[in-house]
Design a protein with these regions (language model features):
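Conserved metal-binding segment of the jelly-roll/cupin
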Residues: 102, 142-158
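A short beta-strand-loop-beta hairpin characteristic of the jelly-roll/cupin
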Residues: 106-111, 118, 126-145
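Non-heme Fe(II)/2-oxoglutarate
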Residues: 1-89
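Short beta-strand His + acidic residue motifs that chelate non-heme Fe in jelly-roll/DSBH
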Residues: 110-112, 157-165
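A short glycine-rich, His/Asp/Glu-containing loop-to-beta-strand
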Residues: 84-104
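Double-stranded beta-helix
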Residues: 30, 135, 174-176
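A short hydrophobic beta-strand segment most commonly corresponding to one strand
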Residues: 123-125, 166-176
């Protein structure tokens, strides 16, 4: 059982066929048609700025609205597992894919919390293995490893990073 009083890491979260289905879709390895939208700053990084401090997102679902034709796949692969197998989710707030670009050296973004104005939990699914990571202020770094899921209390201060050994760092973020 997942305990949100601590950070939980599950490797090989999806069966191989399901993982390949979602990773090839989001990482554009099949049709080159998955749209990402540029965000100027990561986590309101006003003090951390520069040509490297951007990322791109693709929202599947946010605040009771489906935003993507691929949401049924997200529901099938992840949300049903969250509800029925892991019993960690009653309602979804947001599901979003993130792309952090390559930089010559790994760069860390600003510390932040997700939806700080109400209690919620998060799950972060890595789509590729790279030298990027998610860092928790009080718990250290967790490497980006393909098919790895991290569950945590979204009020824990955390941050993302870029990658220096892949084209980009890809993940899917869930808040519930």
């Amino acid at each position: 059982m997942i305990n949100f009083d601590q950070i939980s890491v599950i490797d090989d979260f999806l069966p191989k066929e399901q993982f390949e289905q979602i990773s090839s879709l989001v990482m554009n390895t099949t049709e080159n048609r998955f749209p990402f939208f540029i965000q100027k700053d990561v986590a309101d990084d006003a003090e951390i700025s520069g040509p490297w401090s951007w990322y791109a997102t693709h929202t599947f679902f946010i605040e009771d609205e489906v935003h993507c034709v691929h949401f049924p796949l997200i529901k099938e692969l992840f949300l049903n597992k969250f509800r029925n197998e892991l019993n960690v989710m009653s309602g979804l707030i947001r599901a979003r894919a993130n792309f952090y670009p390559w930089t010559p050296d790994v760069r860390q973004h600003n510390w932040h919390t997700d939806y700080p104005y109400f209690r919620n939990n998060a799950a972060l699914f890595s789509l590729n293995t790279c030298d990027g990571y998610t860092s928790f202020k009080d718990a250290g770094k967790i490497d980006s490893v393909a098919n790895r899921m991290i569950f945590f209390n979204a009020h824990l201060e955390h941050c993302s990073s870029t990658t220096s050994n892949e084209y980009g760092r890809y993940n899917i973020n869930f808040n519930f």
